Regions:
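Short, surface-exposed coil-to-beta transition loops
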Residues: 2-4, 65-71, 97-103
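Glycine-rich portal/gate segments that line the openings of hydrophobic small-molecule binding cavities
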Residues: 38-92
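Short, linear, compositionally biased motifs with a strong N-terminal bias
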Residues: 152-153
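A short, structured loop/turn motif at beta-sheet edges
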Residues: 10-14, 74-81, 105-115
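Beta-strand/loop substructures that line and gate deep hydrophobic ligand-binding cavities in soluble
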Residues: 85-139
Length: 155
């Protein structure tokens, strides 16, 4: 199963790439539907560091636990296009039943705007759980699109 976005953001590509490495942006584009919190003693880092796993937890609407997972960023290029991939995995709760791959690619449109390709591919155990969760995932991804469009000019 997957959810994805292909949206144009009103921000330069370097600003978008920088914002995607910010835990505060991850939090801002998913709440109130999914509220993330750091499990690290010192809270969220200022930036995600490639190769360094950061423990997090999430709750639907801030009250219904979704479980623990971790963010583990990789940066690479595909045919000259920068890609950010989260290799993190679930530890408990719903996240513990999920195998996922989250990739975001940014393309400079040459006019000060950026094309963002954002795709989450996931598999749940049992598979029917993935089907049941898909409508909610789709709603969260549409919310992400709205919030990213709203926030991008401030990046």
């Amino acid at each position: 199963m997957h959810v994805g976005l292909r949206i144009v953001l009103d921000a330069p590509v370097d600003a978008v790439r920088d914002a995607l490495l910010s835990p505060s942006v991850m939090v801002a584009v998913t709440k109130p539907f999914l509220v993330y919190r750091s499990r690290a003693a010192g809270g969220f880092p200022e930036r995600w560091t490639p190769g360094r796993a950061e423990p997090i937890t999430a709750a639907a609407f801030g009250v219904v636990p979704s479980g623990d997972t971790h963010v583990d960023i990789d940066l690479y290029e595909v045919q000259g296009v920068p890609v950010q991939r989260d290799n993190g995995g679930g530890v408990s709760g719903l996240f513990g039943r999920m195998d996922m791959s989250h990739r975001m690619a940014t393309v400079d449109l040459g006019d000060g705007r950026t094309l963002l390709l954002d795709r989450l591919t996931y598999r749940m155990r049992p598979a029917l759980l993935g089907l049941a969760l898909w409508p909610g995932m789709w709603v969260i991804w549409q919310w992400r699109a709205l919030r990213m469009r709203q926030l991008a000019p401030t990046w």
